[in-house]
Amino acid sequence: MEPVLVYNKRETFTKSNLNKLRKEGYIPAVAYGDDIKSLPGYVSKKEFEKLYKQKGLAGKIKILIDGKERTALIKEVQTHYVKGNIIHVDFQILSENKPIYVEVPIVFENAEILKSRGLVLQRQIDTVEIEGLPKDIPEHLVIDLMEYEKPTAIKLRDIKLPEGIKITEDLDEVVAVIDVSEITEEPETEEKKEEGASSVSNS
């Protein structure tokens, strides 16, 4: 069963109040969507960090607001500029029947197969914007490198998309280039050949 993050509403906005929340193990947040203009609140630091580690930025999660379970995107995560800890989170509450635009990671599977084929992968972009209903949005898009046996350029149009999903960017944009690996065995030089012949004649 997918975990549900509890969203607690708050009405005070002072700096001291926000710092108090953080010391008590919470992260200040704001939630917004079609039926929610802007709702300040806070979430459990421990529970959010666990979900964030799994889902990442733009990840889709279940969130409980006013006793109602909703689907939300982790829209923005602010971190302390020195300590690096999370200090604020934005959640976008989704309407199930309205398409959304989301930036998702591109994942390459079976990358190890390229080495055995004398090839190397040169990545050009790591994410791409897609459009679809919230229920159809994947956590990432996959490119299976098992299919590539020679040098080529992989474009956005080459990505196999889940049903109901489309890429909003230029489909001719290059995602990655598969090239010949430059790592080859060092050829034996004339000098080494002569050294080998000399050692044989002296033995």
Swiss-Prot record:
A single Gene Ontology MF term assigned here is: structural constituent of ribosome
SUPFAM superfamilies in alphabetical order: Ribosomal protein L25-like
Pfam families in the record: Ribosomal_L25p, Ribosomal_TL5_C
**What Gene3D superfamilies would the database entry show?**
Ribosomal protein L25, beta domain, Ribosomal Protein L25, Chain P
Q: Where is this region: Disordered?
A: 182-203
Which GO annotations describe the biological process of this protein?
translation
Alphabetic keyword roster? Ribonucleoprotein, Ribosomal protein, RNA-binding, rRNA-binding
Keyword Glycoprotein included in the entry's annotation: no
Q: Where are the transmembrane segments?
A: none
For the keyword Phosphoprotein, the answer is no
UniProt similarity note: Belongs to the bacterial ribosomal protein bL25 family. CTC subfamily.
The record describes the protein's role as: This is one of the proteins that binds to the 5S RNA in the ribosome where it forms part of the central protuberance.
The record's note on quaternary structure and interaction partners says: Part of the 50S ribosomal subunit; part of the 5S rRNA/L5/L18/L25 subcomplex. Contacts the 5S rRNA. Binds to the 5S rRNA independently of L5 and L18.
Question: What is the protein name for this chain?
Answer: Large ribosomal subunit protein bL25
At the highest ranks, the source species' classification is: Bacteria, Bacillati, Bacillota, Bacillota incertae sedis, Caldicellulosiruptorales
Which gene specifies this protein's sequence? rplY
